[in-house]
């Protein structure tokens, strides 16, 4: 058999373990017969890579993906021209509860391939069949070190290799033609011997079963270790609760209609081969590049997602705020491109993954979000900002239940202005709208001003404005003062001239081929700009505008761009005055700070609190720290008024510092890696090594330096091995 078919039910993140069921395998003794196949095969299994994503098992209420794996130098067959053949990607994730296979052989081959690549062997611990038909109904596949051997004649006794290891998967037949993983245990209790594992019965059997055609195929170069990953999907059987609701004119997709159009395919217009070549070339230079494809039942391509190693590394450091840009879909561009976007320590955008989507259905968004989450090792963002779309909103709550979903303020204001047809030639309404949205400091003030505005302009029956107001807690700044946004709320998403991160590269008529040809150039310019900003922040001394100690303090800490923004707040302290304490309750006090805005003077309430440990906490009604990540002018004036010569350290965010560590990997002492746990060593060392590999690909000099470093490292490790104990 060539390749394996794996049916995966995606899941919430590891932080959502309470949502993940633990299915139990139920066997009726009246209908099934237990068969024990305790093959005797000696060997020892390996460490498990740290890809611990507990996939939620919900056959009827979620959309699923079918992961197709084509082993190295084996040819994949059975796909039409819309499906990828011999594509290159990373190996499959570890087995998880909820995986489904088209046959028992596929399930066995998948687990055996997983074991072979990691370095252990498997055997059938037990299986059971129906009494009448002898049809196999279930099985348990275990690590070869499971259990203990019975003592036999001492003269013929072989070396004991079993350790009572509990690693296993439990399978059962469902729907007459599909096998499902009910239970998984990945932990081993013994040392590992990958070389011995490759000589085991299960792996020899797998190697000898390769087809003649496969054996005659030329093998890829030894330095290219690649595998194909393809995600298939079937239509969910149950309709989510939101499917029955209608959409307003301000929303951008038909949730109930698109959800059932499973036959729709991605129209690449001749760009399929270019996409295939693009993935292949990227993987030759970036081993940790990932892509996943969503194929319909007929093999046609529906959706594609890809992400490079740098993006995955950057997300581990800047994963607090994530934006999802669907400008191309919302405006019917020729290129159905979507992008996941983050914000780096310079306040600039970084690309955290791209996709090509066939439609804007709930099912499509769920597939995409789960594909992205899987590539990010199951770590969801804290804040997820999107445009307003009911299908997307439902998918976000399905895949990221713990994330705070917010709407792009720019997209909301754009939709509101577009809905007021009779006022589009006038600047009066946009000006009034901006005053209400940005000028109100308290909820009651905002709601009163909103009501007065819609009455003034005769919009009480405007459906879009009514729906936007119902969702006001997701986009209006007055409701978001307890949500850290890193300055992202006003980033342009949705109905704008071009996708903001690809501005200048993607236009309405940009083809897939044109986009792919400029993709690496775009990324190179982004990385080069970030490197220049890093260099500027580390080497240049910013020019100070005032003599205030806060400015000189942050000049040594913040990156150049963030410091310039903070510098504006320090300069604006001169327009603030009249600090007055209006209330005190123990350690907490309420102050009013006045600010002169043109000819007007406005009051800003600031809460000032000191703890027993003399730690200061401040909160301003303007919400400046939550929106921007550094303190506002009102708090700075109050801190100075109360005698603080430095900004408290809790208000100096690590994400804005010029000395932020760019290794993006866990340190041994960080608490995320247990030095005493061998299962985590592989993942930790692999990440470190891959970072050097990525840097080594930049130039000949980088490659030479990386090679020398690896050679020196290998010598040191060999010295430890040969060192007498």
From Swiss-Prot:
Transmembrane segments: none annotated. One of its GO terms (biological process) is regulation of DNA-templated transcription. GO terms for molecular function: zinc ion binding. It is found in: Nucleus. Residues 1-24, 190-224 are annotated as: Disordered. Keywords: Metal-binding, Nucleus, Zinc, Zinc-finger. PROSITE patterns: ZF_SWIM. Residues 109-193 form the FAR1 domain. Expressed in hypocotyls, rosette and cauline leaves, inflorescences stems, flowers and siliques. A zinc finger (SWIM-type) spans 604-643. Residues 327-416 form the MULE domain. This is Protein FAR1-RELATED SEQUENCE 8. It comes from Arabidopsis thaliana (Mouse-ear cress).
